[in-house]
């Protein structure tokens, strides 16, 4: 089962083509740091993502393949606190 770390509308992009989400929506905001690999989106439409920047309460990230996400670290993590 997939747990979404960062609820987001994956159709919402900035002028640089990065996706945007609110940091306050993250399951564990302290885990959302530049370079972090997360699952973003919704249960019906999600993606592996890499966080690029945090600014004024917003998270800027790009979607990546599972292969690229796995190169950055384990894709298996403990259950989130909200599970």
Language model feature labels by segment:
Residues 45-56:
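Short beta-strand-centered aromatic/proline hotspots
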Residues 30-33:
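Short, well-ordered loop/turn sites that connect or cap secondary structure elements
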Residues 55-83:
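Glycine- and charge-enriched low-complexity intrinsically disordered segments
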Residues 1-21:
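Short, basic/aromatic beta-hairpin or loop at an interaction surface
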Residues 14, 42, 54:
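Acidic surface patches and DE-rich sequence motifs
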């Amino acid at each position: 089962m997939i747990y979404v770390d960062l609820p987001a509308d994956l159709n919402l992009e900035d002028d640089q083509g990065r996706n945007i989400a609110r940091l306050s929506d993250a399951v564990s905001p302290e885990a959302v740091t530049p370079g972090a690999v997360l699952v973003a989106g919704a249960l019906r439409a999600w993606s592996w993502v890499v966080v690029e920047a945090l600014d004024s309460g917003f998270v800027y990230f790009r979607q990546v393949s599972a292969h690229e996400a796995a190169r950055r670290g384990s894709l298996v993590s403990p259950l989130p606190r909200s599970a």
